[in-house]
Amino acid sequence: MYIFKLMGQNLTASQSFPYNIGPIVTGYVGKSIWTLHSGTKKEDGSAVSIFSFDIKKNPSKLEVAKNGFKRAKTTRHPNVLKYLDGLETETNIYIVTEPIQLLDELLEDIRNFENAISWGLYQEGLSFLNNKCNLTHGNIQSSSIFVNKGGDWQIGGLDFVSDVKDINNSILRNHNDLIPNKYKSPEIMKSQWQQIQQSPSYSIDSWMLGCLMYECYNGTMTKAEDIKNLDQIPKQLHQAYQKSFAVKTESRLNPQKFLESPYFQNVFVETLVFLENITLKDTFEKEQFFKKLDQHIEKIPINICKFKILPHLVTAFDLGPVNPRLLSTLLKIGSNLSTEEYNSRIVPSVVKWFACDDRALRINLLENLEHYIQHLNEATINDQIFPHVVNGFNDNPTLKELTIKSMLLFAPKLQEKTMIILLKYFAALQKDQQAGVRCNTTICLGRITEYMNEATKKRVLIPAFSTALKDPFVPSQNAAIQAFMFTISNYSLEELATRVIPEVSRMLISPEKSIRTSAFTAINMFLQKIEKNVDSILPSSPQQQQQNGSTLNTNPNDPNQNSQDSMLGWAVGITKKLYSGENSPITATNNNNNTNTPPINQNNNNGYKSPPINQNNNQNNNQNNNQNNNQNNNQNNKSLQNKQPTKVIHDGWGDNDYQEPPKKQTTTNTPSKSSKYKVEDNDDDDDDDEDYQEEDYSKYKEDLPRLTPKPSSTSSSSSSTSNKLDNKPMSLVSKNKPKYSFDEEDTSSSSSNIVNKNNNNKNNNSDGWGDDDGWGNDEIQVPSTTTSNIKKTVEKKTIVTASKSDGWDDGWD
């Protein structure tokens, strides 16, 4: 029955112990009568350290263990190991403390920080025991000193704490054999207990404190004689060190006096002592302290910064105004916290700081964002921080730029709806008065593209970068070109050909060489992508298929037929796009190879040569054909003029108010052998010379051909693309009758635009991002004629349209 009763008691005790005992700390084995375990609290899983004593295995040491258990529960001081809980059973004694580490295992790392050892030796706890409690510790050594998570040295091993003057107290007298001899004072070694009773309570501890000083700078003592070696001991410590080993017990170092030693007069100790008493300091003292703290923070171990300095800094910011520059120090320290610790200790304060009106504090928050952004989760950023951050877009220029730059770090964690809000702010910032703000907005927009969804990219990127191209600020133009290049993977081939390249090509004639260079580089990149991928996405055109079919019906063994077919195919393709008055080499070739023209027989049956073909008749026929074509075109153009465009095109980023000035350029038309309407740019002044040529040109001004590339194997692809583009209704050049006059030496370049200036401000009702199709409402700008003779004909009502068979190009022959 006794056995079952004992088992029941042990089971009840085990169930009532609210801690999980973990593995043994091997570094502590053999250094104490206690066994040290790591453990956790059952309720919340928080870490603890547990000392256990096995009564059955060490019955002779039970008195010492019970004394240590009692002193641990009753001694409270910041420098004494913090007692959390304990349990005594029939078989074991448990002491639960805060999580700790062994000083022996940390000394190597502590020595790397100047004056860090001095903070450990600044032992107010020992002075408290000796002078306030009149107790002797009796076991001061490196194995009885522990380090908590805040880097503070804690006094443990309270097994021999007693009043040595009490005759009835026999703990130290009866069990001093458990203390290594190298740490014992001479009077203990000689068992001079009567002398000990007459000595100050600190006499034994002072000797052991000197031994601890030695081990901190030299390592573990091997014998008592090692204390005579002062080579590694700092000079500021020599006097106190030597006094600890005084022969007379009353002359030994008092721990209270030791705290006043010059050895502790350093920044490390002064900083930590001030923080421990910061609640007693006035505002001026706090301000002076915080100014100096940033200069010395790197000299303090990280654990001390995290758990001792950081809490005081957070409290200082929450309670009152402090130097905002100190925020960088706080955030650097906080970056070493885990995500859970950061969310509980820093994030609530960060949210509060972003909401404040102190510009200096908000600037520092943005400047140091990289130190804490990784600890902020998406919900916190989108719901609590972002609504306050965007207020910086409406603040002074400094805050605007910092807020824009901060979006590079915020963007990966923004939700879709938050990203849309951000892009609306960016649309407004592209029209900001500050040039630097506009430029940085474009750069930032290009770099956060990867965090947008596909629909947003299609709707925003091209209008946004096109707006930046029109910015008179050169860096903004360059930023837009670079952004187009950086985001090339987000554009389809059709978008590159019809929207991106036309916008960037305007920069080819920029007055700034750097812009021209960037534009050439960008366009080459776009063209390479189109050339590489266009054949894989466009089907063959019906013309190409018909041409392939006609090739199959020909006789491959007839070289003359092949030659004629190839030449006729070229001629037919050109005549569909060109008018008869141009490209004389082609016309001549057609006349020579036309199968309908009777051959010239040089030797006939009558013995005389047949007359040559009348070239004048051919020219007259060509003239009549041109006139008929002109009449038909005029009728078609008039019908188109009466039609209203089905859709007004406008980009959502503002009107196209940027127009390059016309460049001086001389163009020469190639003379035609088959047409009598030869247009030559020889009229360089305002006189009436060569008026017949100007009149002819004015009469047939609408017959000017558009430069068409030579047909090749890819003609079918290009024609297919042009058909797709031609389906979009073209806007009229002008609804009124604008009159333009050009100086004779101001010939229009291929990139100049003839657009009614009164329409520049129309349709400026964008919501910031354009219509759903991504184009907006800008009118399409058509290329103008490029001859100086236009000054007599431009006053006429002119409608420029693109037929399905004609391709747009960049100049004139």
From Swiss-Prot:
HEAT repeats lie at residues 340-378, 380-416, 417-454, 456-493, 494-532. Residues 583-606, 614-637, 712-722, 748-768 have a biased composition (Low complexity). Keywords: Repeat. Residues 1-264 form the Protein kinase domain. The protein kinase domain is predicted to be catalytically inactive. Belongs to the protein kinase superfamily. Ser/Thr protein kinase family. This is Probable inactive serine/threonine-protein kinase scy1. Residues 681-695 have a biased composition (Acidic residues).
